[in-house]
Amino acid sequence: GMIPTKEITPHVPVLVAEIVADVKRACELGITMVHLHAREPVTEEPTYKKEIYAEIIGGIREFAPDLIICVSLSGRNFKALTQRADPLYLEGNLKPDMGSLTLSYLNFNQTASLNAHTML
């Protein structure tokens, strides 16, 4: 997800290689679908950038070409639809199968995720 950090738990995968390795272990247990969040490699902050999603998806497709891949299009940190939809512009086997684009208002523990009325 977007919230856990290495400070909160050392077990959260935040780097591309960590995410891919965790998905591989889950595939070995029999998953057929995965929901991904991407992080900036240096800051480990959540990101919408398709280039980072491409690295993750490409790594997964090497060992699980039929796995259904859903990417986060969260508006919690990035409000513009162009940013949120960026991973959907990937092509070929790097294109995700699904994207979770939540357009409603969501209440979280410490904050709310709000969308502009024009996006609703």
Regions picked out by a protein language model, each given a short descriptive name:
Residues 10-18, 44-52, 114-118:
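Alpha-helix N-cap and loop-to-helix initiation/capping positions
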Residues 19, 26, 37, 99:
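Conserved, mostly hydrophobic/aromatic
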Residues 28-31, 96:
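A structural motif
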